């Protein structure tokens, strides 16, 4: 099969598309583009807004269209340097992308990096049970099998607990327990793991990173601000993916992602009138940040 050549790194971004609210694909596309990465979106659903704090939003399931998009891409011989997936609305969608990843690994010029953000629940520390229960039937089990295909996974702490089938730590988590979780998540399949939104103590949040090849655990200090910033998990996964396909190692890529989020939050805090659900002001910092972090 003739392959369509990529002149810069090319990523298939599998996620939902919300018209308003800066989340998922509306973050992945501009962020990775600013990093010098070609982004090919494969929407799992299309919404008028994201679902946090908005009501009466529209929702279009894209399951059947996903099959048609993939079939067309296959006919074109599209090659991807990475597949990055986020929100999956059903076990069926997970199955569709699992098959496509297997196809790319078998038929591509090289094996694409597979980055999976296993979206299963909101990491809301005041109410750790805020999970998408209306869509959970069979999804957690399917996600556990799905992450076995990944090179990299980026769950938040809630999602890490769901994947490992253990209780969420309502207080801060010890370094020993976090290290154990990172290694057990890697045992599910991925060589590299980043767990986000981890409270190391009451005034400190970290990202826990594990690289199985190096058998190395790193804790990246994120600081702590006592309010949520919607969409930062998607930003982390997007920057991480972009940095990895540009040749950065896992620890360096994770540090770049955390630094970008810190800068975006600092920019957002200059405008306290902006509602939380409108997302963070990452647009103002894109050019300067990635010019300095190539």
For the regions a language model picked out, list residue spans one by one.
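Conserved N-terminal subdomain of the carbohydrate kinase-like
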Residues: 2-116, 120-130, 282-287, 292
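Short pre-catalytic strand/loop immediately N-terminal to key active-site residues, enriched for Gly-Thr
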Residues: 19, 217-231
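Conserved phosphate/ATP/ADP-binding segment of small-molecule kinases
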Residues: 130-217, 225
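Short, small-residue alpha-helix embedded
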Residues: 162, 227-250
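Phosphate-handling active-site elements
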Residues: 216-218, 243-257
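Charged C-terminal helix
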Residues: 251-294
